[in-house]
Amino acid sequence: MNSIKLKFNCKDSLWQEHIGAGDFSFAAIFLTTWGIVLRAYLDTDDVFFEYGLSRCEPVSQRDGIDELVPDRPFNLKFDGSMTVKDTIRRADSVVYGTPLVQDGLEHETHRETDPKRETFYSTCMLFLDGPKSPIDADVVEGTILDDIEFEMKPVVNYDMVVYVLSGKVCYLSYNVTRVSDDQAAHVAATFETVAKCIADVPHRLVQEVESLSQLDVDRLKTWNAYQPIAVETCYQDLFRQRCDLHPNSPAVIAWDGSFTYDELDHFSSLLATRLQAAGIGPDVFVTICATRCRWIPVAMLGIIKARGAFCALDLSHPLDRLKDICDALKSTITITTPTDSNIARKLASTVIVIGGDAPVESDRITPMNDRPKPINGHPTNALYSVFTSGSSGKPKGVVVEHRSFVSSALASIQPLDIRPHDRVLHFSAYAFDISVFEVLTPLISGATIAIPSEKRRKESLTHAVQELGATWALLTPTVARLYDPDEFPSLRTLALGGELAQASDIALWQSKNVVVIYNPAECCPIGVSGPACPADGKFLGWSHTCQRAWIVDPRDHDKLPPIGAVGELLIEGPVVARCYAHDPNFSSPDSPFIQSTPSWMLRLRSNTPSGTRLYRTGDLARYGSDASLYYMGRKDSQIKIRGQRTEPGEIESNLHSILSKDKLGVAIVVLELRGSSKIIAFVSKDTGGLGGDSNTVGQLRIEAATEETDVCITKATSKLHSIMPAYMVPSAFLSVNYIPISRSGKIDRTRLKSFALSLPQETLLRVNNGLETGDLPESNEEHRLQRMYSLVLGISRDKVGMESDFFRLGGDSLQAMKLLALAPKEGLTDISYEDIFRYPRLKDLARKASQSVTIKKDGFGENSSVIHPFSLVIDGQSLIDMAAKQCDIERDSIEDIYPCTPMQASIISLAVKGKIMPFLTFGLALRDHVDTKRVKDTWHAAYRANSLLRTRIIVCAETGQLYQVVVGGDIFWDDDECGNFAQPKSGPSASIGGPLVRMKLVEGQLSIAIHRALYDNWSIRQLLNDISGAYNGLTLPSRPSFNCYVSYAARSLEAASSFCNAELGDSDLDAAKYPEPVSQNSHTNFRAWLGIRVFTCQKESIDVLASEFQLAWAMIAYARTNKKDVVFGVLSSGRSNASKDTKEIMGPIATVTPLRVTIDGTQDVGGALEELQYRQEEQAMYTHLGLRRIGQLGRNAAAACQIQTVLIVEPDLPDLRGVWFSNDATLPNHSDADASNYRLTIKCVVGPDCTDIFAIFDHQSLPIMEVKEILSQFEHILGQIHGKEASQLSVASIDTVNFKDWDTLHKLTEMPSVCRNGLLLSDPTILPQGQMKTFSAVEEAAAHCAFQDSLQEASIARDAKMQPKEPLSSADLISEINRYDLAIMRSRPSPESILLSELALTGDSHSSGTHTVFVTGANGFIGTQILRHCLEDPTIDRVIALVRGSSANEARSRTEESARRAQWWSDCHSQKLEVWPGDLAMPHLGLNETHWRRLADRTTINAIIHNGASVHWLKRYADLEATNVGATAQLLQLAVANPRLGFVYVSSGRYTDPNAESEEPAAANVAATAMPYSQTKFVAESLIRRTAARLPHGQTQVRIISLGLVIGDPLTGVVNADDYLWRLIATCVQAGEFNSSAGSEWMPISDVTSTALAIVQTALNPAGVPATIKPITGGLMWSEIWDLVTDMGYDMEPRPESEWMATVRRDLEREQERHPLWTLSHLVESRSQLNTDAGAGPAWADAWRGDEATTRNLKTAFRRSLRFLGEVGFLPGQKGQNTDGEVNGRAFTRAW
C-alpha cells in the first residue's frame, strides 16, 4: 500500500474551542470530514465506513498492532439542510452510541454492490490516539512515521485507510491494486479541501461544503480548456462537396439497387424540387414512411435540400404512435415508396411516392447535375427529429439542427475509424437516432451506405453483411452477442452502443476493431467513443472535439464534484439539440436543457460565450485519470431496452389509463433475464397498498390469478400493442397483493425488482401464462426446435413441448433473431423471421419447417419483351443445320437464331478482312482474399442469364447474310494454367462459328477476350456492374434479350429508311468530304493523338454540350470548305430515346451515323443549338439502320456516308469499382476502336468542369500541324458558342479565324519550347477571350509501339531563354512546375494505346501475380532501409535498385556497402536484388537502352519508389534541377502512362497539413526560404500533386510520403550524422548549453524503420492511403529532446536564445570548418525555416501528430541513436572526451 500525507491543522481552527468545551469529539470532526468526502464521491446521503480508536498511550508503550483495527461501524445519514456543526454533533452521537463490530460480520453486511461504490468498496479511519484530546503533533512526527508501513498490514483488506495521527498529521493509505496514484491524490486533495471548508465556516450547510480541490480545478482547466468545435455549415453543402469530388463513387449499395454520389445527388434534387413546390422550407418537417431500401437516403437528402427537416418513422411501431409523432411535428407531407404507400396515406394529407415507377426515379430528362433552386438556409435550421420515450405517456421529439449534426459527424469520422472506401451497414431501427448517423455520416466522409433488406436484417445479418461487403457496423451488444465474428469476414470495425458492453462481448469480437460509443439522442448520435476495454465494460471513451463532457453534482448542476466522483454527465457544445418538439421554449421546469451558463464554467473557462448549449443527460458517470468517461448508471428510473431509452413512466401512464376503470394499480420494473432486458408489470387490486407502509400491509406475495384479472391484463396487452412499440410492452404481468412505496412516497421499484428476481423464471412465466408443454417432440425438426427454444430462452428442454409457444415462454423479437441465427447450425434453413411470429408453437413451426421446399433461384426474371426462338428467321431448320456445322456443336444445344444488325455486320466484315482486331482483351486483377470459385460461379450465372454472351456468328454461304446463334452450354475457359492467355486467331475463323467470349482465371488475374460484335461501352460496363452485384448476393437484373433489339430494328426498318432519305436525299455530294479523302491505297493504320483541354461549365446536360460541339465542328468544316451543307459522323449510343426495354438491352447498339448540319448565318446560336438537339432526339430513333443501308438509299445518301470525320461525345467515366476486382481496371473502349476507320476522329470526353478534346488521325496523310490548327480553331469557336454571350450571337458572327493569315497568327501565339531532361516542355496557350485554357500534347507512335518510343526519342536541350533566374521567386517556381507539367500530361496514353498494351500484358508477370519494385536512392540512409524492407517482403519477387556507378559491379558494391553500414545485409538478400547503374541527372535516368525499355515497357515494373535526390544546402537550383526535378518528371511519365504502375515519391514536410496545402501560397513560402534544395523538392512534389489530381477516378497509384526528421531505428541506432538534428545536438553538447526558448516547440520525427516500412507498404497498396500525401506522423518537443540528451550523461545548461545564439556564433567563428554546423550555419541564422526560433515560425499542423505509443517508441529510437553517435565518435563517449567532428565509417554522411 502507498500513502499520502494530508494537510490538516485542527489546532489552529475554531474546532479547538468546541473540542475543549466538550461539544463534540476530535474523532467526530474527522469522521464527518471523511463522510462528506465519500458523500461527494459516491453521490449518496447514506454513508458507511468503519473506524478504530487506540488507547491513549504513548506510541512506545503500545503492545502491538492488534489494537489498530477498524472495529466500529460508522453510518451517517446526511441531511443537506443541516449545518456542518450539527452534522458533527450527529456523528459524535454515532461514535459513542455504536457497538463494536463482531468478527467482521457488520463490515461485510454494509459492503455495497452499487456500481457507484466500486472505487470505494471499503474504507476505514484509524485514530492513533484517543478521541478526545489529540497527542502532540511534534511527538507524532518524530516517532510514528517509521512504524506506519508496519501498522498498515492489519488493514490491507481495505481500499483506503485514513490514519489520524494528530490534529496536524493525517495519512491516506491506499491499495495500489484498487486505487491509482492519481486517484488517491485527488481524494487526498478533496479531503484537505473539505476539511478546510468546514473548519473555516462551520455554520454553513452540508450541501454548501466545497469538495472541488484546486488539483481538480487545474485538471479540469486542462481537459476542457478549449470550447467545442462548431461547424457552421449546412449538411447539404458538405454533401455537395463530396459529390463534386467523387461523383461516380458508390454512395449507396442496397438489396434493391445502388446509387453513385452523382445519381443520389440527382434523384434527391428532383425530390427537393417537388418538395419546394409543395411549400417545404426551413423548419418544416416531412416524415419518411418507408421500409429499409435505397430510397431512404434519397428521401432524407431531398428533404434536406428543400431546407426542410425529416423524421424517419419506424413502421414496426403501432399506427397510433406514428400518428402522434406526425401530430407533434405538425407534418402534413410524408414520403414513401410504393410498398408502404397505404400506411403513408393514413398519416399525412400529402403523400409523395418515390422509387419503382414513381416520377422521381423515372424522370431522367432532368440533367444529372441539376439541383433545386436555392432557398436561404442556415446552420441553425432543423435537420431531423427523433422521438424518445417520455414519462408523460407521450414520446418526446428531439429537434436536431444542421450545425449540431454536422459538428458531431465530422468530429466522429476519425475516432470511429470511418474511411472513404468503407461500406457502413445501415442496420439500426429508424426509432433509433443512430439510423440517421448510419445514413448521413458516410455521405460526407466518402463512404458507402450498405443497406440490407428488412428480411435479411432480421433473419440473416451475417449473409447481409457478406453480400453487401460491409466494413463498418454499429450494433447494440445484445445483437452483437448473437453472432460469430468469423461470419463477418468483411467487417473491419464494430461500434458497440446503445447499452453497456460486457467484457464477454468485447472478448468475443476482439478479432475486429471494436469501439464503444455514447451520446444521448439530445446530443446527436455519437460524441463519445474509445477502443473497447475488456477489463472494464463501463468505459465509454473520450469526448470528440465537437463537445465537452462535464461531471456535475447530481443534486445541483451548478456544482462540480471532485474528479473521480460519481456525478451526472453534462454535455456542452454545438451538438446539443435545439429543444423538444413539444417544448420549444423550455417551459417545462424539469427540462434537461440548461439555459444559463453555470458559474463554474465561467470560472474555469473565462472565454465561454453566452448561449453555450448544455444538456443534462441524467446518466451517472465519472472521470478517469485521463479525462475518459465511465458509465455508472442513471440518476432516475429511465431504462434501456435493446438500446432504446425507455421511461417506465410512459408505460405506467398508459397502463394506468387502461386499467384505471378496473381499479387496478400498476408499477413497472426491468429485469435482466436470459441475456436481455425484460419489462415486468406488477398489478394489484389493492390500490390502498400504494399508500401503505410495507411493515403494516405484510409480506409482498403473488396473488392467485382470477378470470377478471386475466381479462384486464389481456385487454391491457392488446391496447399497449396498438399504441406503443413492441419492446415497450411488458413481457410478463404479475398480480401482487399490493404495490410497495418508499419513504418518499414513490413506488419502491427496488423492492419490486428484488421480489421478481427471487422468483424462479419458470414460475414467473407460468404465473402469467399458464404454460402448457403438450406432447414430447418426435421428428427431427421437432427435436431441433426443442433444443433451439431451450438454448435461446435459457430454460430446460423438459419444459419445452409440442404446445410450447415461443413468445409465451418469454421470447421476443430479438430472441427471434437469435433463433434464426441458430437455425442453420441445426440444419433448419427454411425458417423465416415471419414464420416464428406466424407459427410460434413448436409443433406448428416444426410442421412449417418440414413442409418447406427450398426453391433455388438463379436470380433471373422473365424478360418484359419475349421473342420466341427462331421467330425472326424464315427457314429455321436449315439454319440450325448450318449453325451446327459452322459452330461444330450439337443441334440440340442451339437455343435461337436471328439476323445480325447492320452494326454487327460491319464489324464482322472489317474483322474478316483483317482491318480491325476482332477481339478486345482486358484484365481484372482480383482483390486479395477474394473467393475465386465464387467469381467463377458468378460469371457462370451471368453467362447463363445473358444470351448475348452465348452468341456466335455464322454466315449463309448462299446469301452472305450473317446470323447470330445462341447456344447452350457453359462459358469457354482457357485451361492453360501456365502459358499466356491464348489470343483468338485473326481472320475469318476468329469471327465465324467460334466462341466470341473467352476467359481465363490464373493467379488473381481474370483475363477476358470479347468480340467487338457483342458489346458497346455501356454494355461492357453494365455487365461488370451486374456481376459485381451478383457477387455481393444481389439478384442479377432481368434484361431483355438482344433479339428484342433485332426485332425492333426490323420492324422500324421502313420508317428509318424514310427518315434517313428525307435527311440526306438532297445533301451536297461533297458535304462529307472534309478533310479531303485519300485513296484506299494510301490509307495507313498509324494513328496519332493530339489533345487539348477546354474548361466547360457543365450546367447543361451532356446532350446540350454535344450540340455545342457539333455546331463548332460544322463551323470549322464550313470555314475550311466554304460549303454551308456539312455532313460528318456522330457516334450515337442508340439508347437516348429508345423504349425502356431497348435501353436495358446489352449489345452493340451504339453506332456511327451521318449528321447533316446546314449553316444558316441569319440564325442565332441558341436557335441553331436547339435545332441540333431536336435532330439528335429524332435521329436517335433510327441509328440502327447503319451506314451500309443508308448508302443504298440513293446517290446523295451514299455520298453522305463517305464521312471523313467522326465526332464522339461521351462522359469521363470512372474506373469500375467492384468488391472482387481492383479499381484500376482499364476496359476496352468501343468508340476508340471505331476511330481507326476514319481519317479524323474528334473525341470529346466531358468531365465535371472541363472537356478533354482529342484528335485521332492518320498522321501520314494528315499533317500534325494542320490538326493542331484544327484543334485551336475548334477551341476558339467553341469558346464563343459556350460563352455567356452566345445567346446574343448569330451564326454568321461566329469568328472562325482568317486562315490566310493562320501561319502568321500561329507564330505570334506559339510560345518557345525546350526539351529538358528528356521532356518536351511548352507553355500553355491562353486565348484572348479568357474563357478557356488549354494544354497541348503531341504523341506520334504506331499503335503497336504504345507510347514508349516518344520517351526514347526525346533529346536533351536547354534553351538559355528558359534558364530560371537565381534566386527563384514564387512565380518562377510556378512557371517551372507548369513547364514540366505539360510534358507529363503529354504522356497520358491514348485509350487505343492502353488497349493494345493490355493485349501485350496478357499472361505476363502481371498476370502471374509477381511483384517487381524499382527503387532510386537505395544506397542512402533512408533508401537502404527501403531496400531492406522490399527484399524482406514476401510479396515482392524482385527489387531493382538504381545506383550511381561506372559499372553494374561498382553500383552493386556501393549498394551492399550501404546495407552493411546499416547493419542488415546478408547473402540471402542478394537473391532478389538487381542493381542497375544509372544517374538521375541524365536522360532516361542514365540507364542503358535495355534497362530503360524494361522500365518503360509497362510489364516489368509494378511499383516505383522514388527516394533518390541530390541533397545539398549550398548548390544552386540549376545544379540540383536535373536530379531532383527532371528525374521525377521522367518517372512520372511512366506512372501516368501505365495505370498499373504504383508510384511513391519520398518528400520532406512543411508545417502545414500536406493534403490541405495550396500550391501558390506554398510556392511563396518556399521561395522565401531561398533554399534551392527545398525549392527543387517543392517543384517535384507539386508535379506529383497535379498528376494525382488528373488521374481518372479510382486510379490511385500515385502517392507522396512526406517526412520530418528521420532518426535511427531502435535496434541499431544507425543515423546520417550529417543531418541537421545531429549537428545541432553536437553543437550544443560541445558548447555545454542549449536554447531553452524553443523548448515547447514540437518537431515531426520518425525512426527510419517505421518510415521505410510505411513507404514500402504504400507502394504495394497505394489505394490503402486515402489521400495523395501521407505524412509520417509522430514527433518530439525540443524540451523532450534535450531531456533525452542530458539523460545520456551530457551536461548542458539551458540558456535563453540570445545567449545561446551568441555562443554558437562565437564557436563558429573560432572553429569554422571544424564546427559541426559550419556547412549549415545559414540554418542557424534563419531558424524560422525549421521552426526552432520560439514564436518565429508556425506550429506544425495536427496532421503530423502521432499518438502516445509513437512518442514512446521514438524516445527509445532517439536514445539508441544518441548512443550510436557516441559509439562512432560523433558525440563524446561515456568518459566525456571531446569530438573533433569526425565520424568513423559506421555512420552515414553526405558528400558536400
Swiss-Prot record:
Pathway listed: Alkaloid biosynthesis; ergot alkaloid biosynthesis
Keyword Lipid biosynthesis on entry: no
InterPro entries (alphabetical): ACP-like_sf (IPR036736), AMP-bd_C_sf (IPR045851), AMP-dep_synth/lig_dom (IPR000873), ANL_N_sf (IPR042099), CAT-like_dom_sf (IPR023213), Condensatn (IPR001242), Far_NAD-bd (IPR013120), NAD(P)-bd_dom_sf (IPR036291)
Enzyme Commission designation: 2.3.1.-
The entry's keywords: Ligase, Phosphopantetheine, Phosphoprotein, Transferase
Classification via CDD domains: A_NRPS_SidN3_like
Single GO molecular function: ligase activity
Modified residues (O-(pantetheine 4'-phosphoryl)serine): S813
Lineage: superkingdom: Eukaryota
GO biological process: amino acid activation for nonribosomal peptide biosynthetic process; indole alkaloid biosynthetic process
Reductase (R) domain, as annotated region: 1415-1640
Signal peptide start-end: none
Gene Ontology annotations for the cellular component aspect, listed alphabetically: cytoplasm
Region (Adenylation (A) domain): 239-642
Domain Carrier: 779-853
Residues covered by region (Condensation (C) domain): 895-1285
Pfam families per UniProt: AMP-binding (PF00501), Condensation (PF00668), NAD_binding_4 (PF07993), PP-binding (PF00550)
Record remark on domains: NRP synthetases are composed of discrete domains (adenylation (A), thiolation (T) or peptidyl carrier protein (PCP) and condensation (C) domains) which when grouped together are referred to as a single module. Each module is responsible for the recognition (via the A domain) and incorporation of a single amino acid into the growing peptide product. Thus, an NRP synthetase is generally composed of one or more modules and can terminate in a thioesterase domain (TE) or reductase domain (R) that releases the newly synthesized peptide from the enzyme.
Family of the protein in this entry: Belongs to the NRP synthetase family.
Function (record text): D-lysergyl-peptide-synthetase subunit 3; part of the gene cluster that mediates the biosynthesis of fungal ergot alkaloid. DmaW catalyzes the first step of ergot alkaloid biosynthesis by condensing dimethylallyl diphosphate (DMAP) and tryptophan to form 4-dimethylallyl-L-tryptophan. The second step is catalyzed by the methyltransferase easF that methylates 4-dimethylallyl-L-tryptophan in the presence of S-adenosyl-L-methionine, resulting in the formation of 4-dimethylallyl-L-abrine.
Alphabetized NCBIfam families for the sequence: Thioester-redct
Protein name (database record): D-lysergyl-peptide-synthetase subunit 3
